[in-house]
Amino acid sequence: MKAVITLLFLACILVVTYGDLICGTNYCKDHPCTSPIARASCRSPATYRANHSGKCACCPACVTLLRERAACKTYSKEIGETPSAVCQEPLKCLNGVCTKVTPRR
C-alpha cells in the first residue's frame, strides 16, 4: 500500500512539472509567436487575449468569455490546443461546465 501511495504521489509531481518542462518561464521569449493577430481584429463578443493560442499560449487570440453554467472544454496549452471560448474569470471549467469555485482556506 505504501508503494502504491508513493507511486501515485510521484505521478502527481510528474504531471504538475510536465507543464514547466515543456513551457518553462522563457519558452515564449525563446519561441516568439510567428502569426500574431491585431487587437482590432477581435469582434464582439470576443475579447483579445495577448497570451492564449499556439504552443504554450505564446500567441494572441480572440476569445469568447463564457458565463457561469455555460458548456466548456478543458485544454492543454502544452500541446497547442486553443479554444475559441473559455470560462470568464474566476470561473473554472469543471465537468464540462463553467463553475464558480470557492477558494480554499
Curated annotation (Swiss-Prot):
Transmembrane residue ranges: none
Disulfide bonds: C23-C56, C28-C58, C33-C59, C42-C62, C72-C93, C87-C98
UniProt KW Signal keyword: yes
A Pfam family the protein falls into: amfpi-1
InterPro entries the UniProt entry points to: FPI1 (IPR021066), Ser_Fungal_Prot_Inhib_sf (IPR053741)
Keywords: Disulfide bond, Protease inhibitor, Serine protease inhibitor, Signal
Coiled-coil portions: none
UniProt-recorded Gene Ontology molecular function terms: serine-type endopeptidase inhibitor activity
Source domain of life: Eukaryota
Signal peptide coordinates: 1-19
Keyword set includes Coiled coil: no
Protein function: Inhibits proteases from the fungi A.oryzae and R.oryzae, trypsin and chymotrypsin. Does not inhibit protease from the bacterium B.licheniformis or papain.
Protein's UniProt name: Fungal protease inhibitor-1
Organism: Antheraea mylitta
UniProt lineage: Eukaryota, Metazoa, Ecdysozoa, Arthropoda, Hexapoda
